[in-house]
Amino acid sequence: MGVGWQDPAIIRETGVCVWRSSERPELDFKRNGDFLKGHMALLYTDIPHDTPGNANNLRDYDLIERAGAAAREAVFESSISKLGAAISLSYAAQLKEGMRELPQAEGCVGFKYCGGGWGGYALYLFSARAERDAFVESANCNRAIEPYITIR
């Protein structure tokens, strides 16, 4: 399936979906995403990238598995702090693959590249709405996002 297979699922589903890795990804569980409201932002990195060109790079699958297990637990518990730690583990795996460091943000509990990484967008998770909103106001390339979308 390559990288980024989950992106269409995000558009079709509302809430937070936790996937199990296998031959074909399987939905483990889905829950509403209310606990994420006011905590997330995107940063546009303006870094050109070729995601398919990086699909066969070496990866630390043990670290990726630990990040996934930590994220699953965090979503199950609705824990922003645990989810931030899981996102930070995923980012550590991205750095080991050679991705560029992302800028720090005050009040951010975790950040990482979205999708297959290497550029494009990065997700920033904040402990409080005020910190998220300050981050969004700090640059034109930052946008607040919420766990639900409206398709018109």
Residue ranges, per PLM feature:
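C-terminal nucleotide
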Residues: G2, Q6-G116, L123-R152
